[in-house]
């Protein structure tokens, strides 16, 4: 019934198994990949023909984590997996980025890759395994695909590279880098690092590339016995059309691409495009080519013109040389009632970035397959359509916004203070108000400025820069601070963020094969110079974090209480803590380890709450004198509240030095009295005395007498 095939290798100390032919047999390609005991199912289906009028390649990648994979049931009311989580979105992009460039130009059939995590051993992250499984499924499917692709994670622990570290090892690593590529070239890099230099980062990329070669060999071995017959696909030859169009439009296109201002340049290019369409798509008579074909060839021609200009003249669209960064203006404190704010403008790319400080209640709970955890640093990136002068959908963030926000988050996080140093939840929102390339790196710069404006003690300022590449045969040019057009028409998008001393985040997407180690080295070195230049420009606005928080930011005081006292502070059903919050006005957050965070904009409210909690958890000392309040009287004595919520009995014999007939002869409810803690009885009940304390002065009577006797002698 089943025509099963599998291949198994030892990879970084664990078995990797790729199996096909048993599950999802109606898909064009399906592979179950197992690494350790983590398992994913990858499937791929591609339509047999493109939709009429399709002018782009409709590739969709869906990565999904099933909670049953970790033996869990989804939380929430419906108990069913819902919309994709942030991680699912990010891993979908991670799979998409290295495989997209390997489909042949002109292939426009609807293609969908679905990767499902069906088992998680809580040791091996399924993201890299999902890349491998998707690559294998595509290679077996017969769909036109110039793979296979391999992928690996690289850590850096105690000065050594580690291939595919376990999840628990990542806490020790100063690097989390995922790299993907073919046998000959690197196609994609995604990383977070703790201020590592360019040499270490480049070494990690090459280490990972070498490390996943056995995986590519395994996929090829499986394909030799299990791959379907390749589909016939022959891209159409439009060279004649391109040559004719070049003769018609080259001069005007070259002139248009010398216009430095984006809107004017786009208008000039559109005018040339209109002329070209009018020539090849006459109103009368039958057109030789379709509008989609004319548009695709014109776009190809645009790329050629821009690339030729750069390689021939070393001058770019806006007149800059290869390494010059656009003019930068940095401002902080632009929204004085917010906790921290910045406006970062670089050329025609601009971001308003706002930082907000919150308490432990504001932390985001994340329910992942590996367990529930809390995130205290949030960064949200918004890209409204007006930022590029267009209309469009407004609503929940798309994949691109989530991905760009996470890239900036990775860049900033290594420089944040620890929760012990700065016990605030941090939320940063980046509103992209203008965009002409590198808005994610503008977000990095703006976030650094806004956090410093808010008084968050960043270890060092962070800046980011986007690099580009144009490669034609042996000739190449590395571009600093690329424009949107240079991104679309170039061969590489290489984003580098970090401090003056090292890299904190690196993301690379390469659209062609053949990027060498030498080119990557040049790009990293050029990016370092650009990054330091940007940091210098940012320093014109602010050089280090402000010494104090803004006027409208909450203040937080941290105290620690014994774990066995947490119940007393919270009270039955939360009664005690609710009363403290209501009467003092402060916000209180209690961790399981006894850490208490008290937050308020008022120092008086914080102090009142702190004293209240201290009175609950502290223990009264035997022999000490306390001021208290009579809360109840009885025939045998009076109950006095003398220490926080703690009451104790003053026996009738301890009310006064003379004999007392009735308790009410000496005290009544509500009286303020001085008491001495004499000790505890065998049941732990408090024993208090009033008669040994002078009720007028609060001093011990016995001590006064001794002092008088000593003076008389």
Curated annotation (Swiss-Prot):
One of its GO terms (molecular function) is magnesium ion binding. It catalyses: RNA(n+1) + phosphate = RNA(n) + a ribonucleoside 5'-diphosphate. It comes from the Bacteria. HAMAP family: PNPase (MF_01595). Involved in mRNA degradation. Catalyzes the phosphorolysis of single-stranded polyribonucleotides processively in the 3'- to 5'-direction. Residues 623-691 form the S1 motif domain. Its cofactor is Mg(2+). CDD domains: KH-I_PNPase, RNase_PH_PNPase_1, RNase_PH_PNPase_2, S1_PNPase. Keywords: Cytoplasm, Magnesium, Metal-binding, Nucleotidyltransferase, RNA-binding, Transferase. It comes from Agrobacterium fabrum (strain C58 / ATCC 33970). This is Polyribonucleotide nucleotidyltransferase. Belongs to the polyribonucleotide nucleotidyltransferase family. It is an enzyme of class 2 (transferase). Signal peptide: none annotated. The gene is pnp. InterPro entries: ExoRNase_PH_dom1, ExoRNase_PH_dom2, ExoRNase_PH_dom2_sf, KH_dom, KH_dom_type_1, KH_dom_type_1_sf, NA-bd_OB-fold, PNPase. GO terms for cellular component: cytosol. Residues 554-613 form the KH domain.
């Amino acid at each position: 019934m089943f025509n099963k095939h599998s291949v198994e290798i030892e990879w970084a100390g664990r078995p990797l198994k790729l199996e096909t032919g048993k599950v999802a047999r109606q898909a064009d390609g399906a592979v179950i990949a197992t690494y350790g005991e983590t398992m994913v199912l990858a499937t791929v289906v591609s339509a047999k023909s493109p939709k009429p009028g399709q002018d782009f390649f409709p590739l969709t990648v869906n990565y999904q984590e099933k909670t049953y994979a970790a033996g869990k049931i989804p939380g929430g009311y419906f108990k069913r997996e819902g919309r994709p989580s942030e991680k699912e979105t990010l891993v979908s992009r991670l799979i998409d980025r290295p495989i997209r460039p390997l489909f042949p130009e002109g292939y426009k059939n609807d293609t969908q890759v679905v990767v499902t995590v069906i088992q998680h051993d809580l040791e091996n992250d399924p993201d890299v395994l999902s890349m491998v499984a998707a690559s294998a499924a595509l290679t077996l499917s017969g769909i036109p695909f110039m793979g296979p692709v391999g992928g690996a994670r690289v850590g850096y622990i105690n000065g050594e590279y580690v291939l595919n570290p376990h999840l628990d090892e990542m806490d020790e690593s100063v690097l989390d880098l995922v790299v993907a590529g073919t046998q000959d070239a690197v196609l994609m890099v995604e990383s977070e690092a703790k201020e590592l230099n360019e040499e270490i980062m480049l070494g990690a990329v090459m280490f990972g590339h070498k490390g996943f070669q056995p995986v590519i060999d395994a996929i090829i071995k499986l394909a030799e016995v299990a791959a379907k017959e390749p589909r016939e696909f022959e891209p159409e030859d439009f060279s004649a059309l391109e040559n004719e169009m070049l003769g018609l439009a080259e001069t005007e296109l070259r002139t248009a691409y010398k216009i430095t201002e984006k809107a004017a340049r786009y208008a000039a290019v559109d005018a040339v495009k209109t002329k070209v369409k009018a020539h090849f798509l006459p109103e009368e008579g039958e057109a030789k080519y379709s509008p989609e074909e004319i548009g695709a060839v014109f776009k190809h021609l645009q790329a050629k013109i821009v690339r030729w200009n750069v390689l021939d003249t070393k001058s770019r669209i806006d007149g800059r040389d290869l390494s010059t960064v656009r003019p930068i203006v940095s401002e902080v404190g632009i929204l004085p009632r917010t906790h921290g704010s910045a406006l970062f403008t670089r050329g025609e790319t601009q971001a308003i970035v706002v930082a907000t400080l919150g308490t432990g209640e504001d932390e985001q709970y994340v329910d992942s397959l590996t367990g529930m955890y809390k995130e205290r640093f949030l960064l949200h990136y918004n890209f409204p359509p007006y930022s590029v002068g267009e209309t469009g959908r407004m609503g929940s963030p798309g994949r691109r916004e989530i991905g760009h926000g996470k890239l900036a988050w990775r860049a900033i996080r290594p420089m944040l203070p620890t929760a012990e140093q700065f016990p605030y939840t941090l939320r940063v929102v980046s509103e992209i108000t203008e965009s002409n390339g590198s808005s994610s790196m503008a977000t990095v710069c703006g976030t650094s400025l806004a956090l410093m404006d808010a008084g968050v003690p960043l270890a060092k300022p962070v800046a980011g820069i986007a690099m580009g590449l144009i490669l034609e045969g042996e000739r190449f040019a590395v571009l600093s601070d690329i424009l949107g057009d240079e991104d679309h028409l170039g061969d590489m998008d290489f984003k580098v963020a970090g401090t003056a001393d090292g890299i904190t985040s690196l993301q690379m997407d390469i659209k062609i094969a053949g990027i060498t180690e030498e080119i990557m080295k040049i790009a990293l070195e050029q990016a370092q110079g650009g990054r330091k230049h940007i940091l210098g420009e940012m320093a014109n606005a602010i050089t280090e974090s402000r010494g104090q928080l803004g006027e409208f930011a909450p203040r937080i005081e941290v105290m620690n209480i014994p774990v066995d006292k947490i119940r007393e502070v919270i009270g039955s059903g939360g009664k005690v803590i609710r009363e403290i919050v209501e009467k003092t006005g402060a916000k209180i957050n209690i961790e399981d380890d006894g850490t208490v965070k008290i937050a308020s904009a008022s120092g008086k409210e914080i102090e009142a709450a702190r004293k209240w909690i201290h009175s609950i958890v502290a223990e009264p000392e035997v022999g000490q004198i306390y001021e208290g309040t009579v809360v109840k009287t009885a025939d045998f004595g009076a109950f006095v509240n003398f220490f926080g919520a703690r009451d104790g009995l003053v026996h009738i014999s301890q009310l006064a030095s003379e004999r007392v007939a009735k308790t009410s002869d000496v005290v009544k409810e509500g009286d303020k009295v001085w008491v001495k803690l004499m000790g505890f009885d065998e049941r732990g009940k408090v024993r208090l005395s009033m008669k040994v304390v002078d009720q007028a002065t609060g001093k011990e009577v016995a001590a006064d007498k001794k002092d008088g006797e000593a003076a008389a002698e």
